[in-house]
Amino acid sequence: MPQTSGTMDIAAAARAARAEYERTVTPDVTLDDIRAAAERISPYVHRTPIMESAALSAVTNTRLGLKAEHLQRTGAFKARGALNAIFKLTPEQRDRGVVTLSAGNHGAGLAYAAQIAGVRCVVFMPEHAVPTKVAAVRGYGAEACFAPSMETVFAAMDEYREQHGMHYVHPFGDPDVIAGQGTAGLEIIEDAPDVETIAVCVGGGGLLAGIAVAAKSMKPSVRVVGVEPEGAPVVTRSLVAGYPVTIEKITTVADGLSAPFADPTSQRLIERYVDDVVLVTDDEIISALRMILERTKQMVEPAGAAAVSAFMTGKAGAQEGSRTVATLSGGNVDFEKLKRIL
């Protein structure tokens, strides 16, 4: 069947985007960067435990440990990257203040870090953002601004950034953010040196990229698997396309994994270090969430359960009986939403 002009236009645009990505020089993130970040942020973050669960180990047929980032400062791993980025600002950037976009957890992490450093912080969020996450952003002294949806937040934020001259801290593409998130990977390998597979939840890919750099640099044999919601597959689509893409519509119960666009820096690291990225359904995420709540008594948000769902379904590809670790990425729960989905 001959191609229509519309089909050819789309194909040409994809080829151009792929060529542009291939020409783009992105910053590298190394194990040394991550070790330096760990030293820089250590007074302000928790070294979260890897919690053992006999029940989840039985369900997954692996020896599963849970990296408890829901117990982190601000209730999510995001504080790690935000602190590293804020502490590496130049004096001129500090004076300008920082702005970002977030479904909530990165915004709270950046607000927390900015409060420590005495830097003005503005966070753009979707109007449907979880109220407790909005309250956290404001509670740490940042200004919360809103756009109609997650898909439109970037444009609103970017316009504000231009008007006010603020420094943009990318939620998952800033190399200093990625290095900060990678400190969780350092801890995983140090605390569970026999781990064979690490499953990491994926929104934009900053945590996945950081953990993968750290883990693979320290233990090349370890498998690192990203776990992404089926309704927000921006990293999966970007890997298939061969360049970072934007998705027009996001539909997932895991609001913390709802990035509408990918980034060249994190994508390049994922391509280099990550073994696989798998998709999980909302039902699979909810099933894992229910199991975590019932059997471990840990209060996590849906995004925090995504990595566990990949082991429960077998999608993570772990060998039976092997040592595994899943990230519990956050615990900032919307209780009304929790009642609805459970």
Question: Which residues make up each language-model segment?
Answer:
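PLP-dependent amino-acid enzyme catalytic core
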Residues: P2-L342
